A protein has these predicted regions:
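Short His-Asn-centered micro-motif
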Residues: 60-63, 83-85
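S-adenosyl-L-methionine/SAH cofactor-binding core of RNA-modifying enzymes
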Residues: 66
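Iron-sulfur (Fe-S) cluster-binding modules
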Residues: 1-59, 69, 74-79, 89-164
Length: 164
């Protein structure tokens, strides 16, 4: 889409140019991005996954607001990864209320992140990214058996990752 002056529009704030990893199904990632340290961690993990090309981050608020183009992004995704920072699971609830039932779910509290007591550090972001990748790999390895499960036990998927 071009602007009236003939130049392409600048990307939206927070937009990424990530592309699916070749040979892997397109994954869209949604983070709760809540106001706590755990929400900030979820957001930073999703952004890092998007920059690395492991998934494409999309707007969770747009799902909640039923913005047609953003809902269409979720509908077209071959898979969805939801990252929640705390046990309230706002991101999971938002997707379910919008009619999405099948997605992978990383709950940061299950890997030792405690809302209000885990300041955002690069180490914690890296642990979260590895946990997300472990979940995505686990689903890839078992996709013919489990055929896209609704939820994965993220604690089991990251047994080898040290928690905080």
């Amino acid at each position: 889409m071009k602007q009236d002056n003939g130049t392409p529009p600048s990307p939206a704030i927070g937009a990424t140019n990530s592309k699916p990893v070749p040979g892997k199904p397109a994954t869209v990632v949604y983070a709760c991005s809540g106001c706590s340290d755990a929400g900030e961690l979820a957001d930073r993990i999703a952004r890092q996954l998007s920059r690395a090309g492991a998934a494409r981050m999309s707007c969770l608020a747009g799902i909640g607001g039923r913005v047609k183009s953003l809902v269409a992004t979720a509908e077209k995704a071959e898979r969805i990864l939801v990252i929640d920072g705390c046990p309230l699971n706002c991101a999971r609830h938002t997707l379910r209320l919008a009619g999405f039932e099948h997605f992978d779910h990383l709950e940061l509290h299950k890997i030792g992140i405690r809302k209000g007591s885990c300041p955002v550090t690069e180490e914690r972001v890296s642990v979260g990214v590895e946990a997300a990748k472990a979940i995505l790999m686990r689903v890839d390895e078992k996709s013919s058996i489990i055929n896209r499960t609704s939820e994965i036990d993220c604690h089991a998927a990251v047994e080898s990752i040290q928690t905080f």
